[in-house]
């Protein structure tokens, strides 16, 4: 049920169109990053040049220089010795495209943001949030290089912990933008019991934990192992000695292929169960029921994709669909949490912080 509707406003539409574009670009970048990882292309560029690195090699000499740099790292020597220049170009373009998208996102975010600030289109409440998002984006570039650097000296791949950190930060930025878009939208304030609000926030938090766990699975390539379901390693619950053989025990949570995949499965079961309970509660109280149903259905589809990804040993196409569906789940979880936790004060804050001269007749993001 709803108890109060915010007055229609077009004052944030231009800002929302801009933020929707940024969110879409981040989603594309996450998928390109996934393809870069799955094709084992992430270490093909061994230098970090935030400005001059935007240009790819343009001559044979430059291509050979880039290839020679790749030949110096363990991944080439131990896994790809004998690779041809044409084969190197294939993995190079994936990593270069991923980095280029990062630069494009930075420009698409910063330049309109400065313009909106200059025009007075963004009030104090949103300025702070949007500057924080920009700072997180700048940090993400450094985290990306920190991740790549982990695979340049001793390892033949990047650290799965750093990979998970890199992906998690991208998803935090994406979620922050979606949350801001939803809060800027015209919509009714939902009257719901505290229990429903708490479970919506719990679903969002657990979704982030699950996404981090999934990134660990991807970084370890653990999805190519234990390709049975519902059993894993021959049992519903593997032997404790195999789950916890690393010392100290907590290393198993990050380094043990079996433990990492088992955790990812258990978190999926917990998330699906919580979403089902949340949906039942929402249907019973008629509070944000549509959002609860959408989230539950998305999680059901994602769980199904996850099962098939495991059974088929994580082929690239299926793994990418699984990752794309994770973005859908995160989007719906953010929208549901914001919908149920927004207060009347939050809903009217936009009217204090917007300028009316930037109206664009569009509705780029769902408002209910």
Swiss-Prot record:
Residues reported in the UniProt entry to bind heme: 264, 322
Name of the top EC class for this enzyme: oxidoreductase
EC number: 1.17.99.9
Topology with respect to the bilayer: Multi-pass membrane protein
Gene Ontology biological process terms from the UniProt entry: heme A biosynthetic process
Gene Ontology CC: one annotated term: plasma membrane
Compartment(s) where it occurs, according to its Swiss-Prot or TrEMBL record: Cell membrane
GO MF annotation terms: metal ion binding; oxidoreductase activity, acting on NAD(P)H, heme protein as acceptor
Any Pfam family hit: COX15-CtaA
Pathway(s) it belongs to: Porphyrin-containing compound metabolism; heme A biosynthesis; heme A from heme O: step 1/1
Predominant location category: membrane
Source domain of life: Bacteria
Catalytic activities: Fe(II)-heme o + 2 A + H2O = Fe(II)-heme a + 2 AH2
InterPro entries: COX15/CtaA_fam (IPR003780), HemeA_Synthase_type2 (IPR023754)
Membership in a protein family: Belongs to the COX15/CtaA family. Type 2 subfamily.
Described purpose of this protein according to its UniProt entry: Catalyzes the conversion of heme O to heme A by two successive hydroxylations of the methyl group at C8. The first hydroxylation forms heme I, the second hydroxylation results in an unstable dihydroxymethyl group, which spontaneously dehydrates, resulting in the formyl group of heme A.
Subunit architecture: Interacts with CtaB.
Name used for this protein in its record: Heme A synthase
Organism: Rhodopseudomonas palustris (strain ATCC BAA-98 / CGA009)
């Amino acid at each position: 049920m709803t108890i109060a509707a915010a007055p229609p406003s077009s004052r944030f539409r231009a800002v929302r169109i801009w933020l929707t574009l940024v969110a879409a670009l981040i989603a594309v970048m996450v998928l390109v990053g996934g393809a870069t990882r799955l094709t084992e292309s992430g270490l093909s560029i061994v230098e970090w040049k935030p400005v001059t690195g935007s240009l790819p090699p343009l001559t044979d000499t430059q291509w050979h220089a880039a290839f020679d740099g790749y030949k110096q790292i363990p991944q080439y020597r131990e896994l790809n010795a004998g690779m041809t220049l044409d084969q190197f170009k294939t993995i190079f373009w994936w990593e270069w495209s991923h980095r280029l998208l990062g630069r494009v996102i930075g420009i698409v975010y910063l330049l309109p943001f400065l313009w909106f600030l200059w025009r007075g289109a963004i009030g104090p409440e949103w300025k702070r949030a949007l500057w924080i998002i920009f700072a997180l984006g700048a940090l993400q570039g450094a985290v990306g290089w920190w991740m790549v650097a982990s695979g340049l000296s001793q390892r033949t791949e990047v650290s799965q912990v750093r990979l998970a950190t890199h992906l998690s930060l991208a998803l935090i930025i994406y979620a922050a933008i979606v949350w801001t878009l939803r809060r800027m939208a015209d919509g009714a304030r939902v009257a719901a019991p505290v229990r429903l609000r708490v479970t919506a926030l719990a679903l969002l938090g657990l979704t982030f934990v699950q996404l981090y766990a999934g990134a660990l699975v991807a970084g370890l390539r653990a999805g190519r192992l234990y390709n049975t379901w519902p059993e894993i390693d021959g049992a519903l619950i593997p032997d404790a000695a195999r789950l916890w053989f690393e010392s100290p025990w907590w290393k198993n949570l990050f380094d043990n292929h079996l433990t990492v995949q088992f955790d990812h499965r258990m978190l999926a079961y917990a998330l699906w169960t919580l979403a089902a309970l949340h949906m039942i509660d929402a249907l019973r109280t008629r509070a944000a029921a549509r959002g609860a149903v959408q989230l539950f259905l998305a999680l059901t589809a994602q769980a199904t994709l996850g099962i098939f990804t495991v059974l088929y040993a994580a082929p690239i196409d299926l793994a990418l669909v699984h990752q794309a569906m994770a973005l859908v789940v995160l989007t719906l979880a953010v929208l549901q949490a914001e919908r149920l936790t927004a207060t009347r004060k939050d809903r009217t804050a936009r009217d204090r912080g917007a300028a009316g001269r930037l109206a664009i007749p569009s509705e780029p993001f769902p408002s209910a």
